[in-house]
C-alpha cells in the first residue's frame, strides 16, 4: 500500500507498508530487500509477534524484533533494551529499494537469521515514509 498524504507542505509525505515471510538465511550473500515504491526517508521493520502477553514487547526485550533506518544512516538499527546484544546490519538504499544483511551478531549461528529479521517462516511487517 502506498499513500501520498496531501499535507500543506511542498510535495507532501509518502507512506507505504507491507509484509514478507522470512526465509531463514542471513549474511551478505543473502540480504533482505524491500521495494517501498519511492525514495524513503525512514524505514521500520518488525517481527509480527505479539509476545505471550499480546503487548508487542519487542521494543524493549528482543533485539531480533525490529530495525530502524533513517536517511543519513548506513545501518538498520536494533531497538532493544538488551545491552548484551550488539548487531551490525549494514543497510543501503538504492532508489526505492531498502536492503540490509547481518554482518555480525554475538549469538549462536542458529539465531543469526532472526537477528537479520529473516527467521524462517516468520512474518515481518514494515513501513516507510518519504
Question: What residue ranges belong to the model's regions?
Answer:
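Short, structured motif recognition centered on aromatic/hydrophobic residues
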Residues: 38-45, 128
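Short, structured beta-strand segments at or near domain termini in extracellular proteins/domains
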Residues: 110-130
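Terminal beta-strand-rich extracellular "head" domains
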Residues: 62-91
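Generic structural motif
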Residues: 15, 43, 91, 124-126
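Intrinsic-disorder/low-complexity loop/linker signature
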Residues: 6, 11-12, 18, 82, ...
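Surface-exposed ligand/attachment interfaces on beta-rich extracellular proteins
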Residues: 16-38, 48-63
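Enriched but not universal
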Residues: 1-21, 127-130
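Noncatalytic modules at the cell exterior or secretory-pathway interfaces
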Residues: 95-114
Amino acid at each position: 500500500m502506498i499513500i501520498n498524504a496531501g499535507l500543506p507542505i511542498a510535495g507532501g509525505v509518502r507512506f507505504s507498508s507491507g509484509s514478507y515471510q522470512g526465509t531463514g538465511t542471513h549474511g551478505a550473500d543473502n540480504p533482505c530487500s524491500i521495494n517501498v515504491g519511492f525514495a524513503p526517508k525512514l524505514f521500520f521493520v518488525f517481527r509480527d509477534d505479539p509476545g505471550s502477553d499480546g503487548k508487542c514487547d519487542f521494543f524493549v526485550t528482543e533485539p531480533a524484533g525490529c530495525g530502524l533506518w533513517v536517511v543519513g544512516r548506513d545501518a538498520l538499527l536494533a531497538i532493544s533494551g538488551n545491552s548484551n546484544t550488539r548487531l551490525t546490519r549494514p543497510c543501503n538504499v538504492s532508489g526505492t529499494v531498502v536492503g540490509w544483511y547481518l554482518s555480525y551478531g554475538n549469538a549462536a549461528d542458529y539465531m543469526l537469521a532472526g537477528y537479520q529479521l529473516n527467521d524462517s517462516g516468520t512474518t515481518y511487517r514494515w513501513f516507510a515514509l518519504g
